[in-house]
Regions:
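Surface-exposed, glycine-biased beta-strand/turn segments
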Residues: 1-56, 90
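Short amphipathic beta-strand/extended segments with alternating polar/hydrophobic composition
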Residues: 4, 8, 69-72, 119-126
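Residue-level recognition of beta-strand microenvironments
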Residues: 12, 48-49, 73, 97-100
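Solvent-exposed coil/turn segments that connect beta secondary-structure elements
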Residues: 14, 34, 63-65, 75, ...
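Zn2+-dependent peptidoglycan hydrolase active-site motif and core
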Residues: 22-25, 39-80, 106-112
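Short, conserved secondary-structure segments in the cores of folded domains
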Residues: 25, 33-36, 78, 84, ...
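Glycine-centered loop/turn positions within well-structured domains
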Residues: 27, 35, 68, 95, ...
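Conserved, short, structured surface segments that act as functional micro-motifs
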Residues: 57-61, 84-131
Length: 131
């Protein structure tokens, strides 16, 4: 299940970013400021906090292959039950689209790792998405 409507996005996986001298390791989806973000998978919350790059973000491990990062959420939008160690189900609300951290406008930074390796969210979601 996609965490938000993914019809509009502005930066894809693997795009070179000269300003940071690095590749973009996720997909920036733009469903609109304040849109509810849901968990794309069942799993366990690894972290729900603020960082300079991802802003307010949630990281969920699916217990098998993937760790999923949801970044740039509105301050205060992460529900109180979304804390490290909490169990989430696919479709559970985990926050709202915002523009916190290193962000140029409202969007969801959606990043998936297989172990320590970032993978293209399109490939994973096209293979496993049910919604």
């Amino acid at each position: 299940m996609w965490p938000v409507n993914h019809d509009h996005y502005n930066e894809g996986f693997g795009v070179w970013r000269p300003e940071t001298q690095s590749y973009h390791m996720g997909l920036d989806i733009m469903p609109g400021y304040g849109t509810t973000i849901v968990s794309a998978t069942d799993g366990v919350v690894v972290t729900a906090e603020y960082s300079g790059s991802f802003g307010n973000h949630v990281v969920i491990y699916d217990g098998g292959y993937y760790t999923v990062i949801y970044g740039h959420m509105i301050e205060g939008s992460i529900p109180p039950n979304i804390v490290p160690g909490a169990i989430v189900k696919m479709g559970d609300p985990i926050g709202q689209v915002g523009s916190t951290g290193r962000s140029t406008g409202p969007h969801l930074h959606f990043e998936i790792h297989d172990g320590d390796t970032p993978v293209n969210p399109w490939s994973v979601m096209n293979k496993y998405a049910t919604g």
